[in-house]
């Protein structure tokens, strides 16, 4: 541990205090453990499920089972290759005799010294090949990152759920974005940047989701799928996407009804992005990032979307590191960074709720942002059947 992340010397002009914290960040390698028995039983279960008769499994579930099986098998091979002998063994568990694990040391780096940090493994490839279904499933290229950061959610509980907790920044990007205007120094020509509708969404997300799902008659999905579909709308809007495009691509139909609140949110987010790019704090960074994105051949709007995304992810990562430090101060061991959250090893002598509240206070003191931390389902779910219906 203590290795400087590759790319941290390539940063642009980030806001002063944030830049100073990033410069001091040296704790960017984490020991990650994998449950040996959990990996084995995952492969066995997925083999069995992928061969079930059509009366027991849908065609989509069979594709998902085969995809997860291939991932688990490749994961096993890479884990055997990369597992550090000094980390393998048993995690002490009071009263339980320990859990047999494979251990790996992951180094995290940021691209151009900004945005999120991603995992690497020395001398090994960073990816597991997806295949055609995997690429369509995840809407991205044919490689999926190795490690818990890139692991499908359906497998995480089997791989680490016996001994890890999943700590998450609740509604992370909307919560950050709503607080951004109060942290900007703007030219005199700018008035106040107000986000009343977007702030209401951030605070009452579930009721907004239900209203929008009802308006657009999203009824053929599970509750979790409905929620993710509507959340996707607001993610798109934050980064310059269009209401109409969301309906075409996610609902597979033209936009037939408009939610007035969503239209107001669109207008507010346009003003927010413009203000961030014009601000004293982020203007220099934004100009450099816009130029870098343009050099990739992107059009103007795509450059703006990417740049705003990098800015929010940079703030997110800064907050996440403060959380990591706060947990470590209390004796917790972080194993994995997962964008707006992290995994920590269970310790029966420590109280997770106390750590969550302590980290929230630390984030408020250090960064000025008010966040809510929550534990997502993971710990203790290692014996649950693997979910083949995607949320």
Task: Say what each PLM segment does.
Residues 142-303:
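Helical catalytic core of nucleic-acid polymerases
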Residues 239, 324-332, 347, 364:
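Hydrophobic alpha-helix feature that most strongly marks membrane-spanning transmembrane helices
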């Amino acid at each position: 541990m203590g290795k400087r992340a590759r790319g941290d010397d390539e940063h642009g002009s980030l806001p002063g205090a944030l830049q100073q914290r990033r410069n001091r960040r040296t704790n960017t390698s984490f020991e990650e453990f994998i449950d040996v028995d959990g990996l084995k039983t995952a492969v066995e279960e997925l083999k069995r499920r992928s061969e079930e008769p059509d009366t027991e499994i849908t065609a989509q579930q069979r594709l998902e089972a085969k995809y997860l099986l291939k991932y688990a098998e490749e994961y096993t091979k890479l884990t055997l290759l990369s597992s550090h002998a000094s980390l393998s063994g048993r995690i002490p568990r009071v009263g339980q005799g320990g859990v047999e694990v494979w251990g790996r040391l992951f180094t995290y780096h940021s691209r151009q010294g900004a945005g999120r940090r991603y995992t690497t493994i020395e001398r090994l490839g960073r990816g597991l090949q997806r295949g055609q279904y995997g690429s369509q499933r995840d809407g991205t290229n044919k490689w999926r990152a190795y490690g818990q950061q890139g692991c499908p959610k359906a497998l995480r509980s089997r791989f680490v759920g016996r001994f890890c907790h999943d700590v998450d920044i609740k509604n992370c990007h909307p919560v950050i974005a709503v607080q951004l205007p109060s942290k900007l120094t703007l030219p005199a020509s700018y008035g106040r940047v107000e986000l009343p509708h977007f702030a209401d969404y951030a605070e009452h997300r579930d009721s907004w989701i239900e209203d929008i799902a009802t308006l657009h008659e999203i009824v053929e999905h599970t509750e979790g799928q409905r929620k993710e579909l509507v959340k996707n709308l607001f993610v798109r809007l934050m980064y310059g996407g269009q209401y109409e495009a969301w309906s075409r691509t996610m609902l597979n139909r033209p936009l037939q009804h408009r939610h007035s609140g969503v239209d107001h949110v669109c207008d507010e987010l346009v003003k927010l992005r413009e203000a961030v790019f014009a601000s004293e704090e982020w203007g220099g960074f934004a100009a450099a990032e816009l130029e870098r994105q343009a050099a990739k051949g992107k059009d103007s709007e795509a450059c703006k979307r990417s740049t705003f995304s990098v800015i929010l992810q940079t703030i997110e990562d800064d907050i996440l590191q403060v959380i990591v430090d706060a947990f470590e101060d209390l004796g917790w061991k972080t194993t994995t960074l997962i964008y707006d959250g992290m995994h920590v090893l269970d310790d029966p002598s420590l109280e997770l709720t106390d750590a969550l509240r302590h980290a929230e206070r630390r984030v408020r003191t250090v960064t000025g942002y008010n966040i809510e931390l929550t534990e997502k389902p993971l710990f203790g779910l290692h014996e649950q059947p693997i979910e083949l219906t995607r949320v």
